[in-house]
Amino acid sequence: MAGLPPLLLGTYTPKIDAKGRMALPAKFRSQLGQGLVMARGQERCVYLLPFDEFRRIASQIQRVSVGNKAAREYLRVFLSGAVDQQPDKQGRVLVPQMLRDYANLGSDVVVIGVGTRAELWNKDTWESYLAEKEEGYSDIADDVLPEVEF
């Protein structure tokens, strides 16, 4: 896998402080520490994307958006809520109020690694989501990953 960036993996529980700042998990700083884009994610989470991954996704959506109304609408919502961030010397980023409202983020949050991106979740929402999805985990794998051998 030479040339590929390390995957973002794991589950972390940082806090969002009174100023809206959150410390990036130390293991994510090599991929996100030079800058990242925060954007509205699916299921009311916030995506934390390395710049290159954000550009790749936005470019793919833009290629289909001109003639596809749903793609245009998705692109508008996705890009209008996207914010580029530079972590400070302590590895903290400001989570904008708009995104905190979107994902119902208070001080207790969860950051999960999802391969090429991280996701920022309300702690209670994540725990409920995970509990619900873990029940059908094996069934989902059969449908989504039919060619992957474990």
Swiss-Prot record:
GO biological process: negative regulation of DNA-templated transcription initiation
Highest rank taxon of the organism: Bacteria
Keyword Cytoplasm: yes
Main location: cytoplasm
SpoVT-AbrB domain mapped to chain residues: 11-53, 82-125
GO CC list: cytoplasm; nucleoid
Keyword field contains Ligase: no
Record GO terms (molecular function): DNA-binding transcription factor activity; transcription cis-regulatory region binding
Subcellular location: Cytoplasm, Nucleoid
UniProtKB keywords: Cytoplasm, DNA-binding, Repeat, Transcription, Transcription regulation
HAMAP family listed in its UniProt record: MraZ
Subunit structure: Forms oligomers.
Family under the similarity heading: Belongs to the MraZ family.
Protein name: Transcriptional regulator MraZ
Protein's organism: Bifidobacterium longum (strain NCC 2705)
This protein's encoding gene: mraZ
